């Protein structure tokens, strides 16, 4: 520190061993025990430990993920541990970072449609939306992602602490597909009351569609996005999705 005193790298933090896919410990994560920041820190990166290439608990979740054809991606280590203890075995988490291209492609090795369920606070919802947009360029036929959006200011661990396991199972059985998640989350941020707003949002959708590299996937996403948009303009879009956030202060 400033006084040339040595201090443990994980001082006053709860330590989580992080294993590679073979089950060998290659690093550690540390979570604060109070409200200070950063909430999580990890071991320095090395040839054996690259955060963006790994998913916490994948070594224990992979067999269940293949069997159940689903992989649940949560936000934090405690969420993974709580769900695993409650017999939801195919659960992993990014290593305290944003969900990455490498983690998406890694999850696709075990299921064609992994599920993201981040926390229900504003930060978690922003992270979910950011993950959704990140996935678009890499979509190909039969490879996608889906979302479970938790109610305000909840996380999987708090659900289980409050004995709401059955409520959580209902949410997990009714995920939102990627296209719907992006459309309803983004369109809920604007009013679409005048022509300029409508033109701006239409252009926003066009820009999103252009990021999809696979042409067949791009074609069908464009068709579905435009269909949802025109239904919303006509006021005939009666579809509702439970717990999709109505407003996020910033999606950037």
Regions found by a protein language model. Name each.
Residues 1-110, 127-128:
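Phosphate-handling DNA/RNA-contact segment within nucleic-acid enzymes
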Residues 20-21, 62-70, 98-114, 120-252:
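A charged alpha-helical hairpin associated with nucleic-acid processing machineries
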């Amino acid at each position: 520190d400033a006084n040339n005193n040595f201090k443990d790298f994980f001082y006053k933090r709860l330590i989580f061993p992080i294993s590679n896919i073979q089950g060998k410990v290659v690093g550690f994560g540390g979570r604060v025990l109070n409200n200070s920041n950063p909430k999580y820190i990890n071991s320095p990166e090395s040839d054996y430990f690259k955060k963006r290439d790994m998913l916490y608990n994948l070594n224990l979740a992979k067999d269940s993920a293949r069997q159940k054809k689903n992989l649940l991606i949560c936000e934090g280590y405690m969420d993974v541990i709580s769900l695993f203890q409650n017999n939801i075995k195919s659960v992993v988490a990014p290593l305290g970072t944003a969900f990455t291209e490498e983690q998406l492609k890694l999850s696709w090795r075990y299921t064609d449609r992994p599920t993201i369920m981040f926390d229900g606070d504003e930060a978690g919802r922003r992270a979910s939306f950011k993950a959704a947009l990140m996935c678009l360029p890499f979509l190909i036929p039969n490879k996608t992602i889906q979302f479970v959006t938790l109610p305000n200011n909840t996380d999987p661990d708090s659900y289980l602490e409050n004995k709401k396991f059955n409520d959580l199972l209902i949410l997990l059985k009714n995920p939102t597909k990627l296209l719907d998640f992006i459309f309803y989350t983004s369109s809920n941020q604007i009013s679409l009351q005048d022509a300029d707003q409508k033109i701006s949002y239409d252009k926003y959708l066009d820009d999103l569609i252009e990021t999809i590299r696979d042409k067949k996937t791009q074609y069908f996403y464009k068709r579905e996005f435009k269909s949802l948009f025109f239904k919303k303009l006509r006021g005939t879009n009666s579809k509702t999705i439970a717990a999709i956030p109505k407003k996020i202060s910033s999606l950037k």
